[in-house]
Amino acid sequence: MHPEFLNFTAPFLPCLSLYQSDLHFGGGTPGFTLSQSSVPMVTGLVVEWGDDVKAVTEDEAVVLVNHQATGDVCTLMMCLQDKGMVVRQMMWLMDHIFKYTNFGIVSLIHGDFFIRQGKAHRDQQLVLLEKHLEKYYRSRSRKWIVLFPEGGFLRKRRETSQAFAKKNNLPFLQHVTLPRLGATQVILKSLLGQQENGTPAGGDSMKAENKLKGLQWVIDITIAYPRAEPIDIQTWILGYRQPTITHVHYRIFPIKDVPAEPEALTHWLYQRFIEKEDLLSHFYKTGAFPPLQGQTAVSREMTLNNLWLVGIQSLAFLSGGMWYCILRYFYHCLF
């Protein structure tokens, strides 16, 4: 669906460029925003657990997510649809291979970062990431930056991660892999403000206008699929699997609780993924996430307005019809 939405807005981009801060660069490209809105058309039900991230959608945050399949991105897009304007103010870090997919050009225009994996590219990619953040994050008024610290899909990295854990006397993980430090460290170094925080935007002890710019929170997201069977994009498009309820767990950490030193930050990241392992182990045994300490486990079913979904889908068909008419006109003019 991504190219159709980009195609719909393409004829108007010269006009939209006059209002870059509001439409194109500041709030995300119309094509990308609308393509995100089409995701619920192919996803199943999503149930949310843990902290309520709506409380921090006006603040800057780095979002850490476990990675099992390509469908994780679609799940996140759906979860964000009822979280206000933050869905239009996000930056994504994704594998460079996605640059060559149908939504690659949309992500490029949106200002997302494509990162190459492997030791041969690691140092160079971190330098490029730092420059990319300096160029695009502030200028396009981004709020959240999303990354997958494991550096790849679970099925591809599990064996290597377990061997590394055994060699370094680290916990044996089955449902996640040990995260990599590089990108997370660059993001924290580049985007941290000088003021420590501890209260979400709108809280009693802090007013938004008094806050300095900079990351305020780390949002730790754990995605779980029933029977540990993740959904990829092909499955959603072809629809050859029974409807699935995807579960998403949130934890919010004040940025002041995140250490800056590399060794301490590595330990902190490892602890987050060890906690993810415990969360997923509990989920696969019981079908539910355990409650946070001192709280009762409460799930929230994520729902969207059906009329809104119909409108978004209609826009997709409209874009196709519009380009059919445009191409047909030029064909008759030329031939």
Protein language model regions, located:
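A transmembrane-helix-recognition feature enriched in membrane-embedded lipid enzymes
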Residues: 1-46, 311-333
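Soluble catalytic domains of membrane acyltransferases
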Residues: 38-231
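Short amphipathic
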Residues: 49-50, 245-256
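Acidic, Ser/Thr-rich peripheral helices and adjacent loops at domain boundaries
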Residues: 169, 236-244
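A short pocket-lining beta-strand/turn micro-motif at the edge of beta-sheets
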Residues: 214-217, 244-248
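ATP/nucleoside-binding phosphotransfer catalytic cores, i.e., glycine-rich phosphate-binding loops
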Residues: 254-256, 260-264
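Juxtamembrane amphipathic/hinge helix adjacent to a transmembrane helix
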Residues: 263-303
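Juxtamembrane cytosolic/matrix-side boundary and N-terminal portion
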Residues: 297-315
